[in-house]
Amino acid sequence: MYKSVETILVDIPTIRPHKLSVTTMQTQTLVLIKIITEDGIVGWGEATTIGGLNYGEESPESVKANIDTYFKPLLLSIKAPLNVAQTLKLIRKSINGNRFAKCAIQTALLEIQAKRLNVPVSELLGGRIRDRLPVLWTLASGDTDKDIAEAKKMIELKRHNTFKLKIGSNPLQHDVDHVIAIKKALGPEISVRVDVNRAWSELECVKGIQQLQDGGIDLIEQPCAIENTDALARLTARFDVAIMADEVLTGPDSAYRIAKKSGADVFAVKVEQSGGLIEACEVAKIARLAGISLYGGTMLEGPVGSIASAHAFSTFETLEFGTELFGPLLLTQSILKTPLQYENFELVVPNTPGLGIEVDEDKLEQLRRH
């Protein structure tokens, strides 16, 4: 079945410091998976995280170690022909947790199958509804004037016209004033959202969200702690502005629990956080049945993970709040022979077999961590 499984770490500087409540990034480490079948078909996947262990339970180094130690021997031991579902069932039975690693493996397996069938990965997920996805830009320099200038430049270039601000690392009032100043500078026609990255207590949320709602902000992402799902539900019921669940979503099980208690207005669906493209589509289905709006999230992946996400998001029946698949644009270097196509505020989803990308392996060799 499988001839080789390789895990590659690639450290690429960002175009500017990217400030979150949990860390400030100046370099992103891409975790790439390359699987080759015995008949020579290559599949790529990505398991990139944010800020090492600052954001979640898996780090680039732990993902590589676990794939090399556990996933790789398991895949190479498969002799009988198994389809993707059978292979994923075997992995689930043999390996607990490791959602990001499992997502990367699943992506590579789906790309192999899609190439074998000569179809895009989106076809294996039910077929796409859209060929283009709206993509916002995150303003995260932490400097109000710089963020305003950056936003205006993006609008002028027709690259982004919706913006998200990372807040939560400064005193609450400082962050609120920063956001509202940017919203006023950009005007009523431009959508501005915030991501608190779980930094506020429930009392702080009440104070901050009220001001942000009054200031014209139209989406508040994960304002309180992951563990406090009851607080998230109370905030959702209390405010008119949309409250979005992010870090609290770790796959279909958590999506069901949040939906059952009306715990959010919007779900930020992330393929890695969900455990795979298939699971991300299941999260989207739960949201739709519960009347919860959808947003395509990112782990600031490079082009492999971003376009894999795009294939999944292209199949969603609704995508009311667009996506944030800007990860490759945050990096100073590309690892593709042809970069992803961003134009007119959107990302074009390739219609060629597999993920529809070609990794530049010479460039990868130059950049990889040895």
Swiss-Prot record:
Pfam families linked: MR_MLE_C, MR_MLE_N
TM region positions: none
PROSITE patterns for the chain: MR_MLE_1, MR_MLE_2
UniProt GO molecular function: chloromuconate cycloisomerase activity; manganese ion binding; muconate cycloisomerase activity
Family according to the record: Belongs to the mandelate racemase/muconate lactonizing enzyme family.
Subunit and interaction comment: Homooctamer.
Name this protein carries in UniProt: Muconate cycloisomerase 1
Organism lineage string: Bacteria, Pseudomonadati, Pseudomonadota, Gammaproteobacteria, Moraxellales
